[in-house]
Design a protein with these regions (language model features):
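Primarily recognizes the serine-hydrolase "nucleophile elbow" in alpha/beta-hydrolase
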Residues: 134-193
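Catalytic nucleophile-loop/oxyanion-hole region of alpha/beta-hydrolase
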Residues: 56, 93-97, 101, 113-150, ...
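Short beta-strand/loop motif that positions the catalytic acidic residue
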Residues: 230-232, 236
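N-terminal cap/lid segment of alpha/beta-hydrolase-fold proteins
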Residues: 39-75
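Short beta-strand element of the alpha/beta-hydrolase
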Residues: 77-87
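Mobile cap/lid helix-loop segments that gate and shape the active-site cleft of serine hydrolases
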Residues: 59, 189-220, 226
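C-terminal catalytic histidine-bearing segment of alpha/beta-hydrolase fold enzymes
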Residues: 68, 129, 245-290
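Conserved alpha/beta-hydrolase "acid-adjacent" motif
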Residues: 237-243
Length: 290
């Protein structure tokens, strides 16, 4: 089954807009790339508890990766969502644009893990995938402590994060039950000589066909793939419509349940800054499938 929604975006409340405007600045300047992590801390509100800067990779991992954990106050076993920040696989601090989404999910009763991963150009693929698979393992191995229902896991994010969310979610070994991928590249070979894809994959498509195929989620779809929620700006200038269209066509071909939320008239950045009801609809989608 597939559902298509065409939306004219509205603005977010001021605090969310401010958070998402920071995302635009980071995309433009990569100013937060070198920021050191803050000391580990725990914050508690009436409805959620947040544990910042939790190391989730093993001690012998190439570089320690951190996550902020959002725990709902409910005593019931909670479904879990892995948030994966964007930034062209090369930048962005995870809190720049994911804190609002993380809090919304946690208030809805989800355990949320907002995780980092190794960045290009220093680290080539599959380092990013390997890090995020460790995040999945962390949730499974700590399910009792954090009251996680590991049979209900999802991946979620936008742009490069959406690409990684799809890649992680479509691997059956990770046991993901739902995917949210916004503004996400689906076939990296659509950029045969792209700078960012070249940094990620070690060069252009020519001579690197195998790794481009391996890093493109469109090739991982099967009849057993989990449901997918896609949202994308109709005027996306960075991740052209051939990406969501190819992904949608492949999902349809294999009979995978999916919903599509088109954000009318928005570019890549503006669809992220002003996403209309894309995020609430994505959370509704998770409610149905987790």
């Amino acid at each position: 089954m597939s559902v298509c929604i065409l939306a004219f975006p509205c603005e977010f409340p001021h605090n969310m807009l401010r958070t998402r405007f920071c995302t635009f600045l980071v995309l433009s300047t990569a100013a937060l790339n070198s920021c050191a992590p803050a000391p580990t801390s725990t914050q508690t509100s009436a409805s959620i508890t947040v544990r910042n800067d939790v190391v989730f990779t093993p001690k012998n991992w190439p570089t320690a990766q951190l996550a902020d954990l959002y725990l709902p106050t409910s005593t019931k076993s909670a479904p879990a969502v892995l948030l994966i920040h964007g930034g062209g696989w090369s930048g962005k601090e995870r809190r720049a644009d994911m804190t609002g989404i993380a809090r919304s999910l946690a208030k809805r009763g989800y355990f949320v893990m907002n995780a980092t991963y190794r960045l290009t150009p220093e680290w080539k693929f599959p380092a990013q995938r390997d890090d995020l698979e460790q995040a999945i393992r962390f949730m499974r191995s700590n399910a009792k402590e954090f009251n996680i229902d590991t049979s209900r896991l999802a991946t979620f994010d936008y742009s490069a994060g959406g690409h990684l969310a799809a890649l992680i979610g479509l691997d059956p070994a990770n046991g993901v039950k739902a995917i949210v991928a916004g503004g996400a590249p689906s076939d990296l070979a659509f950029w045969p000589d792209g700078k960012l894809t070249g940094q990620l994959l070690g060069g252009p498509v020519k001579g690197n066909e195998k790794i481009y195929h391996e890093a493109s989620p469109v090739h991982d779809v099967t009849t057993n793939s989990p449901p997918v929620f896609i949202y994308h700006g109709t005027d996306d200038d960075l991740v052209p419509l051939e990406h969501p269209n190819a992904f949608i066509a492949t999902l349809r071909k294999h009979g995978v349940e999916h919903e599509v939320y088109w954000i009318e008239g928005r570019s890549h950045v503006l669809a992220h800054l002003f996403s209309g009801r894309a995020i609430p609809e994505a959370i509704n989608f998770l409610d149905k499938h987790l």
